[in-house]
Every structure is written in structure tokens, then in C-alpha cells.
């Protein structure tokens, strides 16, 4: 199959997904899903200013200093925070001491009084999730403006972080990547988010164990570990290649413009290879140290099922990141515009599990597995991308506790803020498999807060039409979506699951990719 998508013997067109199962909640809640009946919604309306949500935390997220010549390790939490104490009266079924903004969110969340009484702690967990000072957007996914979409073949690399108080939506960011022709992005509440760790802090020295004094020591820690801009630039100079990318790559074609950077396709002069190049203005990056983290991780993670990092250059304050370009677009385009059969789903799951087995063997958790972060080659290759959220686990810290990822794909242990490990990626893969069946993840038609509550309390989601799936596929889903982490399958174990033996050749994905592109063209 050539990249131009021409087939000599054209097979019957694959089934196209005629309509989405998403329905608007119809409420006035600004956090409610606002979907049309089309598979992909129209361009989001201009965001109105939101009231700032009162934070239960006293500090801000800290950067961590990276070690020379090593993949950066995410340090154990050192922010000892003083929190607001919220109580729950079991008799009246009311919360006490709740900040006014939280109360407003709860009123419009569609979480019923019965649900609140049944599990008040889960309610508080999801409210904390929306705290304005804990929600952070991914730093390295590129931000396309409304008029310039990026082809999904260009790996995500964020060049803007909004400092605006946010729930799941942000004023300027969009880590979903559109394939030409430009299509409307998915709903804002399907974007990736990051919240700070809430793991119990490392015991403080005697005499400093009180939470308030811990907060003071947190400030000292931040001063010690925060990298200055000059230190960051110096570190970048040690990891990038020397030279001018404008001379090593030619035929630059602008395919997108973000608030602080530009994305191009270009051709490697020496190899004749088409690549994606991100030109990032570092002066507009508030979290430059996270760029170092992702570049170092990407440089070290070489695998056939991971989008390949090729090179990076620093010219003044401009960072050029060269990545593999996949012309097929993102899996999101396929799942929202076409209907996949089980054998095609098995093929995608197998490729993703191969990537996850490699990552987990290298003590790396991706933490944001979803169809948007799976890119396809025109010949059907399947590759994971977007390592802005990845975390390294170490012998000293084998579990993470930061709430990271995208709400609808999050594992219950992440939503409930428990310590977690690599199997959060397996849960997200299971949700992505449902996405491939139904065109969207479970609970997407719910208010985001209630969706998080349902994930935390219900656990394994119900399928819309389970009887239509084969027993072997249902068993695979059950192994991925097992609430008990110990019983949930690992990537290595699931690669041996009988369902994957049903997989069609990867070339079977090519007609779906082409059909998705045609459908998007007609939706313009």
C-alpha cells in the first residue's frame, strides 16, 4: 500500500460510524458535556471567564532537577500541604465546611443525593480533582489554533500551558491532533490533565511533623530543587544536537501554528525521509524543565511501536524537535468515523501491548493511553506517542499517586488517589478497546464530575451491547478492566491472551484509515 492511498483492486468500503452515541445532558452546568449528534463536535464556542475555584492546597507544583546522563527520575513528593477539612453529616446527607465553589460544582454535577450519601469520600475525591490550583494541562502537546489544525501524524508536543484556572477544559490548549482536512476537536473535557501528588509525604524530621510546618519545609524544598531558566537552557544544550536544522532538513511545509510554536513537515536532506518538526519558543514555556524530561525519555525509548524521536536542536531560544511522521493520523479518527471489527481491534491492542510491555520493562508508565495518543501509518503500523505524562518508577518509589491522564480513561485507583503502578496503562487500554467498539469511552455523555464519581465507585464500566461481542473479547476486556489491580493482567500476560490470536494483518487497517479521511473530508 502506498501512502497516496490508491488501491488497484478496491475492496468494499468499511462501515462508517453514522452517528455518535453521545447526547447532551441539556443542563446549564458549564462542565457538562455539550455534544452534537455528529461523531465529532463542532468547533468549541469561545470560552467565558470562569470563577476561580478555591484551592485546598497551599503551594504550587514544583519542578524537579534532572540528573546528568540519566533518564530523569520523578522525585518522591515533598510538598507537605495543609488542606481544608470537609465533613459529611450522614443524618442530613449534607457536607459541612465545603468551599462555596465546590458546593456549586456539586450542585451542577448530576451526582444525586443518594450517590453522595453512598460514597461521600468519592465525591470529595472528584471535587479535589477539579481544584483550580491542582489541574494542569500537559506541557508538551502542541496547541493548534481554531483555524490551523495539525495532522495527527505529527506527534504531540505541547507548546503552551494556560495559567487560567481550569476544570478539564483550558482556554487555549488542545492536545487532540487533527488530520487534514481540518476537523473539529473532541470535547474539551476529553483532554489530558495533570494534578499534583496527594501521596502521604515522606516523614519530616522530628519537630517538623505538623502539617503546617511541613508546608514551610515544602517552600524550602522548592527553592532547592527548582531549576532556573539558565540551568534549564544549559541542560538543553547538553542534550540537543549541534547544527542548524534548516540546513539538515528541506521542503519545510507549515502544517500548524500554535500560540508559541509552529509545526512543519520536512524532508531529511541526507535520507530523503519525511519528518515532523516542532519549532518551540522556549520563552513562552512556563514549565521548561518538563520539556527536558520528555526529550530525555523519548531519546531513550526506541521501539517499533513507539513514535520515534529523531533529533533536537537549539537555536537561540528556539527548540526544534524532530519526530517520525505518520501520515495515517490518530486512532481517534478511525474510531469516531468508522466501525472496526474484533480482528482489527485485536491487531491494535496487540501493537499497543507490545509498546506497553517495553515501557513497563523499562520502569516507565505512560499514564495517558487513549486513541488520541495512538498514531497510524498508512500501511497500518500502530505506534504510541505523547510522553508528556510518563513517569519513571524506581525501587525506592514503585508506585505513583499523582492524578494524571484523561478522566474517561483513568483507572479507579488514579481517580481515588491511591498509589498506583504500570497497570493503570492496562485499564486505559481496556477503555480504549471499548472506544474502538462504541466510538467513545464510557460515561462520555455524563457530566465530567459524575463520570469520575462513576469510575471511582462503579469500577468496570458496562458495555452498551455486550451480547454483540464474542466471549473471548469480553474476557480480554474483563482482564484489562479488573478493579483488583493484583488480578488485572499485565502487558506481558495479556500478550498471550487468545483474543490477540484473532488479529488481522495490520494492512487491514488501511481501508479504515482511508475511509476516516474521506468521512472527515465530507464533514467539512
UniProtKB/Swiss-Prot annotation:
Keywords: Acetylation, Allosteric enzyme, ATP-binding, Cytoplasm, Kinase, Lipoprotein, Membrane, Nucleotide-binding, Nucleus, Phosphoprotein, Serine/threonine-protein kinase, Transferase, Ubl conjugation. The modification Phosphothreonine is found at residues 60, 134, 143, 159, 169, 402. Gene3D superfamilies: CRIB domain (3.90.810.10), Phosphorylase Kinase, domain 1 (3.30.200.20), Transferase(Phosphotransferase) domain 1 (1.10.510.10). PANTHER family: NON-SPECIFIC SERINE_THREONINE PROTEIN KINASE (PTHR45832:SF21), SERINE/THREONINE-PROTEIN KINASE SAMKA-RELATED-RELATED (PTHR45832). GO terms for cellular component: cell-cell junction; cytosol; focal adhesion; glutamatergic synapse; membrane; nuclear speck; nucleoplasm; perinuclear region of cytoplasm. The modification N-acetylserine is found at residue 2. It comes from Oryctolagus cuniculus. This is Serine/threonine-protein kinase PAK 2. A motif (Nuclear localization signal) lies at residues 245-251. The modification N6-acetyllysine is found at residues 62, 128. The active site is at 368 (proton acceptor). The keyword Glycoprotein does not apply.
Amino acid at each position: 500500500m502506498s501512502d497516496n492511498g490508491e488501491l488497484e483492486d478496491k475492496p468494499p468500503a468499511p462501515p462508517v460510524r453514522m452517528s455518535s452515541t453521545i447526547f447532551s445532558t441539556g443542563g446549564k452546568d458549564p462542565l457538562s458535556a455539550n455534544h452534537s449528534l455528529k461523531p465529532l463536535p463542532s468547533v468549541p464556542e469561545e470560552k467565558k471567564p470562569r470563577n476561580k475555584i478555591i484551592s485546598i492546597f497551599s503551594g504550587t507544583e514544583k519542578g524537579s532537577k534532572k540528573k546528568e546522563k540519566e533518564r530523569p527520575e520523578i522525585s518522591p513528593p515533598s510538598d507537605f500541604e495543609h488542606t481544608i477539612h470537609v465533613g459529611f453529616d450522614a443524618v442530613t446527607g449534607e457536607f459541612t465546611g465545603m468551599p462555596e465553589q465546590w458546593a456549586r460544582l456539586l450542585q451542577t454535577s448530576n451526582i444525586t443525593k443518594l450517590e453522595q450519601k453512598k460514597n461521600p469520600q468519592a465525591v470529595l475525591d472528584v471535587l479535589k480533582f477539579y481544584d483550580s490550583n491542582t489541574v494542569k494541562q500537559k506541557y508538551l502537546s502542541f496547541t493548534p489554533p481554531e483555524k490551523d489544525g495539525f495532522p495527527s501524524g505529527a506527534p504531540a508536543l505541547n507548546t503552551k500551558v494556560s495559567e487560567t484556572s481550569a476544570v478539564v477544559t483550558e482556554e487555549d490548549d488542545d492536545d487532540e491532533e487533527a488530520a487534514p482536512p481540518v476537523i473539529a476537536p473532541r470535547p474539551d473535557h476529553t483532554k489530558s490533565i495533570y494534578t499534583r501528588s496527594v501521596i502521604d509525604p515522606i516523614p519530616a524530621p522530628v519537630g517538623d511533623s505538623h502539617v503546617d510546618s511541613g508546608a514551610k519545609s515544602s517552600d524550602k524544598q522548592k527553592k532547592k530543587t527548582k531549576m532556573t531558566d539558565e540551568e534549564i537552557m544549559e541542560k538543553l544544550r547538553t542534550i540537543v544536537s549541534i547544527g542548524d536544522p534548516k540546513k539538515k532538513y528541506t521542503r519545510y511545509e507549515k502544517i500548524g501554528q500554535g500560540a508559541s510554536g509552529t509545526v512543519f513537515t520536512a524532508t531529511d536532506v541526507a535520507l530523503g525521509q519525511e519528518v515532523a518538526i516542532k519549532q518551540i519558543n522556549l520563552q513562552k514555556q512556563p514549565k521548561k524543565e518538563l520539556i527536558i524530561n520528555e526529550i530525555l525519555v523519548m531519546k531513550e525509548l526506541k521501539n517499533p511501536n513507539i513514535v520515534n524521536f529523531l533529533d533536537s536542536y537549539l537555536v537561540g531560544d528556539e527548540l526544534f524537535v524532530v519526530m517520525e511522521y505518520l501520515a495515517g493520523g490518530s486512532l481517534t479518527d478511525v474510531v469516531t468515523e468508522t466501525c472496526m471489527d474484533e480482528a482489527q481491534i485485536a491487531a491494535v491492542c496487540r501493537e499497543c501491548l507490545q509498546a506497553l510491555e517495553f515501557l513497563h520493562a523499562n520502569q516507565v508508565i505512560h499514564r495517558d493511553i487513549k486513541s488520541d495518543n495512538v498514531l497510524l501509518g498508512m500501511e497500518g503500523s500502530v505506534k504510541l506517542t505523547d510522553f508528556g505524562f510518563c513517569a519513571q518508577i524506581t525501587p525506592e518509589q514503585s508506585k505513583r499517586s499523582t492524578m494524571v491522564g484523561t478522566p474517561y480513561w483513568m483507572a479507579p485507583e488514579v481517580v481515588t488517589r491511591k498509589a498506583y503502578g504500570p497497570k493503570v496503562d492496562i485499564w486505559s487500554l481496556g477503555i480504549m478497546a471499548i472506544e474502538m467498539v462504541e466510538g467513545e469511552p464510557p460515561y462520555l455523555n455524563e457530566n465530567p464530575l459524575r463520570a469520575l464519581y462513576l469510575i471511582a465507585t462503579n469500577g468496570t464500566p458496562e458495555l452498551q451491547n455486550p451480547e454483540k461481542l464474542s466471549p473471548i473479547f469480553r474476557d480480554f476486556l474483563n482482564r484489562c478492566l479488573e478493579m483488583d489491580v493484583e488480578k488485572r493482567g499485565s502487558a506481558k500476560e495479556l500478550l498471550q491472551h487468545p483474543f490477540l490470536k484473532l488479529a488481522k494483518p495490520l494492512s487491514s487497517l488501511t481501508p479504515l484509515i482511508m475511509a476516516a479521511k474521506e468521512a472527515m473530508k465530507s464533514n467539512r
